[in-house]
From Swiss-Prot:
Protein name according to UniProt: UPF0728 protein C10orf53 homolog
Species the sequence originates in: Mus musculus
Domain of life of the source: Eukaryota
Short name of one Pfam family: UPF0728
Record-stated family: Belongs to the UPF0728 family.
InterPro entries (alphabetical): UPF0728 (IPR027885)
Length: 93
């Protein structure tokens, strides 16, 4: 995938530490930072599927995971899921 691809980051609601279920982006910060560092344009899209994160490139889902498995905040450098997602976007056609 060329640099500066458009990546749609679809994310669902989740419950954090007993709080109500809602869409939150705190756990997406590292993933966004890693993709932005590679020069990709990121579009956030809320979905209704609980706990789900999907990366869509050229209308194809190239990566998905449970949002609660992503590290909270940070730059994503030490999160293995962020690296896995970055590679999936780079390998997308």
């Amino acid at each position: 995938m060329p640099a500066q691809a458009v990546v749609t980051l679809r994310y669902g609601p989740y419950s954090a530490v007993g709080l109500s279920v809602e869409h939150r982006t705190y756990r997406l910060q590292g993933l966004q930072a890693v993709l932005a560092k590679d020069g990709h344009q990121i579009i956030l899209e809320q979905i209704e599927d609980w706990n789900l994160v999907e990366l869509v490139v050229n209308e194809e889902t190239v990566f998905q995971c449970d949002i609660q498995e992503l590290e909270f905040g940070g730059d994503g450098k030490l999160d293995p899921l962020c690296e896995e997602a970055r590679i999936a976007v780079l390998n997308a056609f």
